[in-house]
Structures are given as structure tokens and as C-alpha cells.
Amino acid sequence: MGSKHKKNASKSLRAFSFIILSASIALVYIFNPVKLIFPSSIIRFHHGLPPQSQEIVTEQPKSHSKFQLKHIYHHGSGKNYKIHRRLDITPEYLAKHDAYFQHFNQLQSGTEQVSLDNLDSVVAQYDWPKHHQGKNPWTIELPMKIAKRPAVRLKQRHDHNYIDSYLQYALSVKSNPQHINNVQLEWISEDISVPDVKDRDTVVSLATISSNAYVRFPKDDDEKKNSDWIDVGEPWVPDDRNNNIEFGWGDDGLRGHIFVSEDNKTVVIGVKGTSGAGLPGSGSEETQANDKTNDNLLFSCCCARISYMWTTVCDCYEKTYTCNQDCLEKELVRKDRYYQAVLDLYRNVTEIYPSESHDIWVTGHSLGGALASLLGRTYGLPVVAYEAPGEMLATQRLHLPQPPGLPKHAENIWHFGNTADPIFMGVCNGASSSCNLAGYALETACHTGRQCVYDVVTDKGWHVNLLNHRIHTVIDDIIMTYNDTAPCADQPPCRDCFNWRFTSRDDSLDDEPPLPNPLRPGKPSTTSSSQHHTSTTTTTETSRPQKCLKRTWYGWCVEWGDEEDA
């Protein structure tokens, strides 16, 4: 009897041990399942996000590299939109302007008294973050961590003519899926090099590149004679009437600063943001007029039509809360607008650094960040933008290509911002807002890609203020004060300009695109008469498009003319 009890006890002990062992294995699988199944990679889930926002990230070995400024591009806009030039930052160039750089470092180190009446001193003081105080923005080396992530991009993205033809066709058919599918876009999935946005040094370095685009450039009399700039667009020769035009940092245009890695394999394009009076920390007033025009075109509901007292940037407004969608889309793709300028800038960069053999990233602050996002979506480039206004509306109006069913976390577009910045949060509008008083109609709030937001209102008790939009504030007082980078999540459901009605020519037409078709000749305008059972056909001549050439101070048009007379 005793031995029988011992056997039963032994069986019970073995059964209990088996249960404990099984439970232990189960717990290991529950809390660390992927390491046991996939020892070569780690899949991480971002907890705390809604299911549709959870991102599965496959981490792979990361590399480090240092980046340095190699080129500056300037693309003209407005009446000078055909001008495009490049400045190479060579040792000879740095030696030539050594005195200016030493003076700049003295300003940053605080050894020289800065007068609030001296605009140059104030701009220099605010253009460069304190984190890099004493460092030369033209020779600084910026460390970054490079990661690998999957991406879905157009196979023909290296063919600029193909991209142009697609954008024109997509605009003509309003991105109608039935017709876009006929193009048979070919998407390819591949692992690409991207900036590691979870590494604080990398986020700071990219923000520094965005800040670098604001730094003033040394100019002298030789500079006005185009001694250092290389024409990559339409040549320009000074004459007696135009011998004082300043290029590179002139009154019209878009700037891009090109940083290149040590191994010459990775290129970062830093797009300059808004320069203008009334926006603190946005640089000098060098490109104020065109920056404001493009800001109001990209981020307003209808050409910056806020009230009858505003001068609109285009003639698409029809009546109260009604706007012509076709007109808006044509304005965005005009050759003298910034979207075309940033496309041309990218194409000239790829002449030196071909996209087939180089990894190209884009970054920018404010307007520069939004343009970086539009460029990245057009060509499938990784983008890190800082404090950019909502660019989703512009993306839709431009009908940019997007892989079907691709989740936002796979787009490789990251928007960094803070909750105390009214421009990034989309609340810098209304009659009493600072943006409105400065002449900016920033009415959009929706972003594409992922949003990485520092909640400084909750964490630090900050108040919403336009001063928190400055790039050096973002670097010195936000990113550098947090141990980790901001968590990234999808944009919640968002719609801009919901109270506006947008009209289009295809509202009353069939869905067939009005493209040349040899099998279906165009229909002439006809007038029929029932008398004598005869009909006559007359072709009416379409009138040339006209636009407003001159307005009164309260917005009433007093002079109309042809498009080319503007």
C-alpha cells in the first residue's frame, strides 16, 4: 500500500513538473515570441496605438555616417523661374570667404554684442541652433544613423519624363481609378536606406540641415557677377540694367542645401522654408514675396480668399465658399510655382548623384518640409519634415502617385512637430491669428505619412505660440530636452476645407478623359433650327483665358487681361 502511494505521488510530481515546464515555455513564447522563431530579426509592436496604427518594424543592422554640405542650389520662381544655378562648397570657396565664417562664429559664440536694430545680426543669431554654437555651418559634420526599411515605389521613378507624363495624365483624369489603372503602373517592393528616426542624433542632424538652409550666405561684388555659381538651367548674363541682381539668395526662388555622406552613397536635400515678415524665426525676408504666394496657394482652401479685403494669389474663387478645383490644380503645377521648382531641383541633383546608385533623402522646415513631402511622394523618397503645415490637401490636388493599399507607416514620410506650434497643428487661422495678421492663409491641418509629435503643452506646460514654430526652438528647447524621439503614429481621420464646395468641369461631363483620340474627333459647337428641317453647324472660337491684372486694396478687380500679360 505504501509503495502504491509513493508511485502515485511520483506520477503527480512528474505531472505537476510537466505543467510547470509547459507554462514556462508558454510564457517565454508570449513575452518573447519572435526571438525564438526569427532569431535573425526582431519585430516590434508599438503598443498604445489603435490597431490600424500599429506598425510592424523589421529591425536590421544599422550603420553610421557623417554628412557635410557639398552644394547649394537656387531655383528661380516668378518671372525668373527659368534660372537654376549651383554653388559648389569647395576648399577654395571656403578659403575665399574665411573672414566671413570667422565673423559668423563670433556672432554665435556671443563674443560680439548683437543689436536688435541690426537685422543681419538678429537673423544670424536666430538662424543657427545653440546646440551647434561655435561651429561653421559650411563645414560642420553631422552624424546620422542609417536603417533599412521596406518601401514600395514606382519602377519607372528614375525616368523623369515618365513621371511628368503620368502627373499630366493624372491631373487630366482627376486620378480616376478606372483610367489610372489603364496606365498599369508598375510598383516594386524593396528594402531601402532611410534615416533612423528613433535615434535622437539623427533627428537633430536632419533638423540642422533644415536650419542650414536659412543661414545667410556671404556675398560681395564678385558674387553679383556670378563668379562662383554654375548655370544648370537657362544661362543669365549681367547687363547694364541688371548688373546688381543677386543670385542664389535673391528675391525670387527656392533653395536647396545638399549634404553628402562620407562614402558618397547617401545624399540629403534640405529645402528652405518660409522667409517673411511676421513669422518669427523663419529667416530673413530674401524670398518673402514668392514664399508667401506659395504658402497661400498650397495651404489655403481657395487662393487665400479669407475675405473681400484679401488679395488672392489666383483667380479660382467663384462665390461664397465655392472654388474652381480645375483652376486650383493648374495653379499648383505652373512652371513658376515652388512644386515645379523642387522637382527641377531634384532632377539637377540626380545629374550629379544618380538615383539608381545613390540613396536620396529630403528634409525641410515649415514650407520646406511640405515641399519635401510632396517631392518624396512624387519619387518615393524618404522624408523627414519639421513643423510643416498640412500638405495632404496639396497632395490630393496634385494627384501624386500612391501604391494601392499601402499603409501610412510604409510611406517613409515622417512629420516632426510640437503641440505648441499653431502652424503645425493647423490652428493658425482666423481673423485675430498671427498668421492672418501677417498675410498668411494657413488653413490646412492634415498631414500625410506619420506624425511624430512632442506634447510640450502637457509635458512642459507651454502655451500655443507662433514662436514655437522656429527651427532653432525645435532643436534646442524640444528635441534636445527629451531623452527619446517623439513616438510616431498615423494621422487620425482628417479633412481640410470641409465647408467649401469645389466645382470642376467634369461635374457635367462623362468620365472619359478629354485626351486626343483619332477614333473620336472633337465635337464642334452646333446650333439647330427646326424650320425647313435643316441644321447649320458653326464652330465658336474659344476665348483666351483671362486673369485679374490689378486689384484695389479691398480685392476688387479693376483690370483684366490675357494670361501672358500677367
Swiss-Prot record:
Keyword S-adenosyl-L-methionine: no
GO cellular component, one term: multivesicular body membrane
EC numbers on record: 3.1.1.3
Entry annotation: catalytic residues: 366
Region annotation Disordered: where it falls in the sequence: 507-545
SUPFAM superfamilies, sorted: alpha/beta-Hydrolases (SSF53474)
Residue spans crossing the bilayer: 18-38
Cytoplasmic side: 1-17
Molecular-function annotations in GO: phospholipase activity; triacylglycerol lipase activity
GO BP annotations listed: multivesicular body membrane disassembly; neutral lipid catabolic process; phosphatidylserine catabolic process; piecemeal microautophagy of the nucleus
Matches recorded under Pfam families: Lipase_3
Keywords: Autophagy, Endosome, Glycoprotein, Hydrolase, Lipid degradation, Lipid metabolism, Membrane, Signal-anchor, Transmembrane, Transmembrane helix
Annotated glycosylation sites: 264, 348, 483
Entry-linked PROSITE patterns: LIPASE_SER
Broad class of where this protein is predominantly found: membrane
Subcellular location(s) per record: Endosome, Multivesicular body membrane; Prevacuolar compartment membrane
Role noted for this protein: Lipase which is essential for lysis of subvacuolar cytoplasm to vacuole targeted bodies and intravacuolar autophagic bodies. Involved in the lysis of intravacuolar multivesicular body (MVB) vesicles. The intravacuolar membrane disintegration by ATG15 is critical to life span extension.
Protein name: Putative lipase ATG15
Species, as recorded: Meyerozyma guilliermondii (strain ATCC 6260 / CBS 566 / DSM 6381 / JCM 1539 / NBRC 10279 / NRRL Y-324) (Yeast)
Gene that this polypeptide is encoded by: ATG15
